[in-house]
Curated annotation (Swiss-Prot):
It comes from Chlorobium chlorochromatii (strain CaD3). This is Aspartate--tRNA(Asp/Asn) ligase. The keyword Transmembrane helix does not apply. The record marks H43 as: Important for tRNA non-discrimination. ATP binds at R232, D233, E234, E494, G546, L547, D548, R549. Aspartyl-tRNA synthetase with relaxed tRNA specificity since it is able to aspartylate not only its cognate tRNA(Asp) but also tRNA(Asn). Reaction proceeds in two steps: L-aspartate is first activated by ATP to form Asp-AMP and then transferred to the acceptor end of tRNA(Asp/Asn).
Length: 605
């Protein structure tokens, strides 16, 4: 395990040096080492032990004349904990191990103490063979000894420290906000905590410190941050841990959107350049409006490394004889095209698989035109005139060997389907995993139409400041109002959402009224915020990048559990601690609670 930060060793009876920091400069020095038996090899006359500590591995040698040591070492199991004393010697030239930082030396030990002899292991630590996630999580303390996971946790610690240093240099103040707070009906489900002192009442674990950090702005702390634990009762995903996660929570007073962008871009550029081999594509990060990103990439979380872009061809089909496309040239609908260069001569299987994926995304089918060596082919060709084909070629810059895929229908639905196809075709390209292609998504709609409830709803954060403030709310159609909301995205992963906040009570009342809330409802739900804003609130805004996701990206991990020391499984269970678990009746009575479990369905037959 390589650790780029030199270790300060506490000298005592267990150790004077660290395994991974020994090298040829320590030749003939007497050392004390302690750690875990990584591997043991008996070569007849000699026993070799790879001793591992937090800094790396060092090879120990027990010579045959040391009969007592030899006998003791023969019964050692892997992962036993030992402390040794010995002398550093240089390895023979043909025995040097260039993969180890201590590979030029070995330690001939003179005495050994077995601090803890390990029982047979549930899985191998040294070989890192594939192991079921269930077993890994049950014995997480053992899993954490494995090199890659161990290094991920060390990296996470170093990254957190670097973030703190950077923000402190930018005059941010770290402030801890409450863990026990009130429940909010918005967002994900809360984790509830019953109150013993107030029977029938509950605290909630915070889904985010959102309201507290805004109140800190009102309190006169102009730059706040916190590595904040957040709790949401939601299902697991590869990039989301169930139960709890950590975010870099930030808020700033007297700022505009671009001021916050500059701070976060500077921080990300700093930690990437100093702590990672990865490189950022472009600084400042591109700013892309929500409308533009949906039109071009079909998602508000685009992976800009994919060399494909959706193009609008609605105007080309206004008078087309192909009625399926012509009827989707009216307002609110569109016709989109996705050109894949050099793939026009693929087999039928290629197109069948693409159509299957399009149907999985919600499309009725997938129209396409292949520009093969012998001419244009595909199910759409017979419906298009020569003029239509020429217009397409010119508009899309099509060449022989290309293929163009089409989607048509309602604007948002069509964009999303074509965005899904863009991601599907990403496998045709070799994307650089060391490239970090960040972007800001801006100008989100303030409202959206809820088809199910047949009403106007907030599309994102209801506490965002509308662009144009009160004038926009009073004079514009609700669905045309934009908000000062923004997302930061990297390689198709959303790291965070943020916003410039609505700090003016009358604008807040009006914004909620458009979404169907009365003043009384707003006061009932958010009265403490309204009251604070009436007593002098500065303009402010913030963001909260997910720390777990950022570490996941920088460590090249596909699963967020690989960067969390003690994660839950996908069923929100801690297999190591057997949580959640039942509690005693006495504990429930003390909290004035009674558990009523759902009735099990009786098996028929």
């Amino acid at each position: 395990m390589s650790n780029p930060v030199e270790q300060q060793v506490v000298c005592n009876r267990f150790r004077s040096h660290s395994c991974g920091l020994l090298n040829a400069t320590f030749e003939q020095q007497h050392v004390r080492l302690a750690g875990w038996v990584h591997r043991k090899r008996d070569h007849g006359g000699l026993i070799f032990i790879d001793l591992r500590d937090h800094t790396g591995i060092c090879q120990l040698v027990i010579q045959p004349e040391q009969q007592a040591l030899f006998a003791e070492a023969e019964h050692l199991h892997n992962e036993s904990v030992i402390s040794v004393e010995g002398t550093v010697i240089l390895r023979a030239e043909n025995a040097i191990n260039p993969r180890l930082s201590s590979g030029e030396i070995e330690v001939v030990i003179s005495c050994m103490s077995i601090e803890s002899n390990a029982h047979p292991l549930p899985f191998s630590v040294a070989d890192e063979l594939p192991t079921s996630e269930e077993l890994r999580l049950k014995y997480r303390f053992l899993d954490l000894r494995r090199e890659k996971l161990h290094e991920n946790i060390i990296f996470r610690s170093r990254l957190t420290a670097a973030v703190r240093r950077y923000l402190e240099e930018k005059n941010f103040t770290e402030i801890q906000t409450p863990i026990l707070t009130s429940s909010s009906p918005e967002g994900a489900r809360d984790f509830l905590v019953p109150s013993r002192l107030h029977p029938g009442k509950f605290y909630a674990l915070p889904q985010a410190p959102q309201q507290f950090k805004q109140l800190l702005m009102v309190a006169g702390f102009p730059r706040y941050f916190q590595i904040a634990p957040c709790f949401r009762d939601e299902d697991a995903r590869a990039d989301r841990s169930p139960g709890e996660f950590y975010q870099l929570d930030m808020e700033m007073a007297f700022i505009e959107q671009e001021n916050l962008f500059e701070i976060l871009e500077g921080m990300l550029e700093h930690i990437t350049s100093t702590m990672s081999k990865k490189r950022i594509t472009q600084v400042p990060f591109p700013r892309i409006s929500y409308r533009d990103v949906m039109n071009r990439f079909g998602t508000d979380k685009p992976d800009l490394r994919i060399p494909l872009e959706i193009q609008d061809v609605t105007s080309l089909f206004v008078d087309s004889g192909f009625k399926v496309f012509a009827k989707n040239t009216v307002p609110g609908c569109c016709v989109k095209a996705l050109v894949v260069k050099g793939r026009g001569n693929e087999s039928r299987l290629f197109y069948d698989k693409a159509e299957k994926r399009a149907k999985e995304l919600g499309s009725a089918g997938l129209a396409y035109i292949q520009f093969k060596d012998e001419g244009a082919k595909g199910p759409l060709v017979k419906f298009l005139s020569e003029d239509d084909m020429n217009a397409l070629k010119q508009h899309l810059n099509l060449e022989q060997g290309d293929v163009v895929f089409f989607g048509a229908g309602k604007w948002e639905v069509t964009c999303k389907i074509m965005g899904g196809m863009r991601n599907y075709f990403a496998d045709l390209f070799t994307l650089d995993k060391d490239e970090l292609s960040f972007c800001w998504i801006v100008d989100f709609p303030m409202y959206e139409y809820n088809e199910e409830a047949k009403k106007i709803d907030f599309s994102h954060n209801p506490f965002s400041m509308p662009q144009g403030e009160m004038e926009a709310l009073e004079t514009k159609d609700a669905l045309d109002i934009l908000a000062y909301q923004y997302d930061i995205v990297c390689n198709g992963i959303e790291l965070s959402s943020g916003a410039i906040r609505n700090h003016k009570p009358e604008i807040m009342y009006k914004a909620f009224a458009i979404a169907g809330y009365s003043r009384e409802e707003v006061d009932q739900r958010f009265g403490h915020m309204i009251e604070a804003f009436k007593l002098g609130a500065p303009p402010h805004g913030g963001i909260a990048p997910g720390l777990d996701r950022l570490v996941m990206i920088l460590c090249d991990e596909q699963n967020i559990r690989e960067v969390i020391a003690f994660p839950m499984n996908q069923q929100a269970q801690d297999l190591m601690m057997s949580a959640p678990s039942e509690v005693t009746l006495a504990q429930l009575r003390e909290l004035h609670l009674k558990v009523e479990l759902p009735k099990k369905e009786e098996k028929k037959g």
